[in-house]
Design a protein with these regions (language model features):
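Cytosolic nucleotide-binding catalytic cores of signal-transduction proteins
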Residues: 35, 40-115
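General nucleic-acid-binding
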Residues: 1-53
Length: 115
């Protein structure tokens, strides 16, 4: 029984360490966004870590967006989170490396999705 408990504790510790590293990375990405740094080199995992971190610091906003829009990609949810952070269209375009048409298209798809 003691061996099972030790094994489970080791698994819990490994999961906690992994989650801690991901949240730390999410914090770094969040700070980058606050400084209007570009996401152009972000991987899908980076988007996921940013969203996970944002969910920890502002769960109601993430929950609201997920409820209002059923088919959110990590990139689209990140766009909504940037809007929630009060970023201007120009800032969002710079951060997400979007053209004016790309920004319009994203807004159109989101408005169409929420109908």
């Amino acid at each position: 029984m003691k061996e099972i408990i030790e094994e489970l504790q080791a698994k819990i510790d490994a999961i906690m360490e992994d989650k801690s590293q991901k949240l730390n990375r999410g914090l770094k990405l969040y700070n980058d966004v606050n400084n209007n740094e570009s996401m152009i080199r972000w991987s899908k995992e980076d988007y996921d870590m940013f969203i996970d971190y944002f969910d920890v610091i502002n769960h109601p906003i993430v929950k609201k967006h997920r409820k209002e829009h059923k088919k959110l990609t990590p990139r689209t949810l990140t766009f909504l989170l940037l809007c929630s952070m009060g970023k201007s269209d120009e800032d969002i375009r710079q951060i997400m490396a979007l053209s004016p048409e790309g920004l319009r298209s994203m807004r159109f798809r989101l408005n169409h999705d929420s109908d």
